[in-house]
């Protein structure tokens, strides 16, 4: 009886080894019922655990984008902030800004448009579909601030709106215009433009003056 028991066990082990070779699995000298029991005991990861794992991987991949050296130098400069306009002042009552915007109940939108040669900024009241104030690097009065250059295609002298410094100045100008009208907070709408280069410089220039983005 003892010899027959050993023979049967050896035959079962041999059959298990052959089965593993056929299925292209690694050879395990264990009976089949033990293999199935181990598979059942394995815990499946929940969807929450999967999402947390994916988020951790994304955070590790993300790296902090370094700012440009020109913008860092501009941020170190001392900028004169615009004095806050009182809510019930005569200038505020005559302006085209609603009382809800001045009190902060409704927040207008700072729309930015960036091209190769120029940058545009305008503050829009989406409720009334009205432009409250705007500025751009094409304004002839800003030639001394932004600087000029001669365009080869047209042989015309135009404002230099291609640099980070020009975007910084445009940001300061739009910020001063907004604060003088009683607008202290805006939503920054950069559209399809990435938050880098001139777009970032414009936003930081508006913040430097005292405008909340």
Curated annotation (Swiss-Prot):
Broad class of the protein's primary localization: plastid
Keyword Secreted attributed: no
Matches recorded under InterPro entries: Ribosomal_uL18_bac/euk
The entry's keywords: Apicoplast, Plastid, Ribonucleoprotein, Ribosomal protein, Transit peptide
Location within or outside the cell: Plastid, Apicoplast
Any GO BP: translation
Any one Gene Ontology cellular component term annotated for this protein: apicoplast
Keyword Glycoprotein: no
Gene3D superfamilies recorded: 3.30.420.100
Highest taxon listed in the record's lineage: Eukaryota
CDD domains for the chain: Ribosomal_L18_L5e
SUPFAM superfamilies, sorted: Translational machinery components
Gene Ontology molecular-function annotations: 5S rRNA binding; structural constituent of ribosome
Family: Belongs to the universal ribosomal protein uL18 family.
Name of the protein this chain belongs to: Large ribosomal subunit protein uL18c
Taxonomic placement: Eukaryota, Sar, Alveolata, Apicomplexa, Aconoidasida
């Amino acid at each position: 009886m003892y010899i027959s028991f050993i023979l049967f066990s050896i035959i079962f082990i041999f059959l298990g080894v052959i089965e593993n070779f056929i299925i292209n699995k690694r050879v395990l000298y264990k009976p089949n019922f033990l293999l199935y029991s181990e598979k059942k005991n394995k815990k499946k990861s929940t969807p929450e655990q999967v999402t947390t794992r994916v988020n951790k991987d994304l955070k590790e991949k993300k790296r902090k984008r370094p700012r440009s050296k020109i913008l860092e130098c501009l941020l170190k400069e001392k900028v004169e902030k615009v004095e806050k306009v009182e809510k019930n002042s005569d200038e505020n009552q005559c302006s085209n800004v609603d009382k809800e915007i001045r009190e902060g109940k409704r927040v207008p939108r700072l729309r930015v448009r960036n091209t190769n040669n120029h940058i545009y900024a305008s503050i829009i009241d989406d409720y009334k579909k009205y432009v409250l104030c705007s500025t751009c690097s094409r304004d002839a009065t800003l030639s001394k601030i932004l600087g000029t250059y001669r365009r080869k295609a047209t042989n015309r002298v135009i404002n230099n709106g291609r640099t980070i410094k020009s975007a910084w100045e445009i940001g300061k100008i739009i910020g001063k215009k907004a604060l003088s009208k009683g607008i202290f907070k805006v939503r920054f709408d950069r559209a399809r433009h990435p938050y880098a280069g001139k777009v970032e410089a414009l936003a930081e220039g508006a913040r430097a003056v005292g405008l909340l983005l």
